[in-house]
Regions:
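Sec/Tat signal peptide C-region and signal peptidase I cleavage site
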Residues: 22-26
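Bacterial N-terminal signal peptides
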Residues: 11-21
Length: 220
């Protein structure tokens, strides 16, 4: 009897170790220059007071599946984001080139088991569990014609474990050294909110930053 119990216990332990190993393979640090996320968002802007926010949802994280509860959309996305309020400063236009400056700040990533994102409600993108608190550097939103671009770098302030489909994840394992985000922004406005009446749709891809210091080269 004892032998059978010991054998069963050994099998349980081996299964646990196997599952732990599989989970570890699912999450690993992305090398510098590798893609750490894709996202869809909207820049919300109030032209009367020059303030704005950015919100949206993620369509890709490496090693994480089941990002949606149905067909991919804002309303089915488990992972959303929202920035703090930004001060936006338009610069004088140069021909058909328009530039808007935005200061550095903080934004958060959320995991919502029961998503209900709605472009008409900023609060719908900040519901659920906070899984990451990130910084963003000074932004320069560059527009020409019907579209524009934006690029910024950021660092990780804090990340928190979350459970999805029975597995525990942490976004800090993917990009612990920070990230650089590249966005394409539509200059054709859409509906915003009562606080930020102008919305500019956007889509982004971010890559992992490299080490802060390169090793010193050796001389022979």
């Amino acid at each position: 009897m004892t032998k059978h119990l010991n054998g069963a216990l050994r099998c349980v332990l081996e299964l646990f170790l196997l599952l732990s190993t599989i989970s570890g393979f699912a999450q690993k640090k992305v090398p510098a220059g590798g893609i750490v996320w894709n996202s869809v968002g909207q820049v919300y802007f109030n032209p009367n007071n020059g303030t704005g926010q950015v919100a949206g949802y993620f369509t890709y994280f490496p090693g994480i599946n089941d990002l949606f509860t149905g067909a991919p959309s804002a309303g089915t996305a488990h992972f959303t984001f929202r920035s703090d309020t930004l001060q936006l400063q338009p610069l004088p236009a140069q021909g058909n080139l328009n530039v808007i400056l935005a200061g550095a700040g903080v934004w958060k990533v959320y995991y919502n088991p029961t998503p209900a994102g709605d472009w008409g409600s900023l609060d719908s993108f900040s519901e659920g569990q906070v899984v990451a608190v990130l910084t963003h550097g000074t932004k320069e939103l560059i527009g020409t014609g019907a579209a524009g671009t934006n690029m910024f770098s950021g660092d990780v302030i804090a990340t928190y474990d979350f459970v999805l489909a029975g597995q525990t994840y942490n976004l800090g394992k993917i990009f612990p050294g920070g990230f650089t985000n590249f966005s394409t922004i539509s200059n054709v406005p859409s509906s915003g909110t009562s606080e930020f009446p102008v919305g500019l749709p956007s889509a982004s891809t971010a890559i992992a930053k490299g080490p802060e210091h390169r090793p010193e080269s050796s001389t022979k």
